[in-house]
């Protein structure tokens, strides 16, 4: 083969009938296109465990309430003025004061296990009640965990109620998430019309916005939401005493 027949390895020659076009030889990549990690998670095929009939619980609304109650001899000093105002509207102050830890959907045949571990999580928890407002047709006061113990005495200060909910979920309970803030119901306003409810709510907000109470729960109860009541108080299905070991620790205790 003579020199005129040599091919230039750096190009590919296409020879149509009229012109000659020279194109650079570019290697073809065999690498796969990289995807963003978020796209990988979004579009990757996922394998799910088949759902069994026993895994499905038909529950339109919560059936049980896990709640914290207080010593019945506790004197709520700042609530006297609230009771007097409610009397003018023929509204009864709630005799069953409590704070809800979680609402649970329990179908037929669902049983509650021993909830004693929750009492250790919730022990020595001081609640601060402040800020009265209306929530739907209910007059409530906001509640939050008060940081009163040093970290070396109580490691979950301010986290007890969320940890209690996590414990229930981890142990198979179907917790109903309301999205409502932690609070304590003071009175039902169902007997009032919308204008009266709004007026009462604003009146309490203005006059009692600085009302603050402190209390420490003494018992954990499980009640049926539509269950029996005795003297206006829900009859508990189960109850577990809470042993507050540092209730006499007064270094940072603002209340009783």
Curated annotation (Swiss-Prot):
Cysteines joined through disulfide linkages: none
Keyword match Metal-binding: no
Keywords from the UniProt entry: Host cytoplasm, Host nucleus, Host-virus interaction, Inhibition of host IKBKE by virus, Inhibition of host innate immune response by virus, Inhibition of host RLR pathway by virus, Viral immunoevasion
Amino-acid biosynthesis as UniProt keyword: no
One Gene Ontology biological process: symbiont-mediated suppression of host type I interferon-mediated signaling pathway
Entry's localization field: Host nucleus; Host nucleus, Host nucleolus; Host cytoplasm
GO cellular component terms attached to this protein's record: host cell cytoplasm; host cell nucleolus; host cell nucleus
Matching InterPro entries: ORF4b_HKU5-CoV
Main function: Plays a role in the inhibition of host innate immunity by inhibiting the interaction between host IKBKE and MAVS. In turn, this inhibition prevents the production of host interferon beta. Additionally, may also interfere with host antiviral response within the nucleus.
Name of the protein: Non-structural protein ORF4b
Organism: Bat coronavirus HKU5
Lineage: Viruses, Riboviria, Orthornavirae, Pisuviricota, Pisoniviricetes
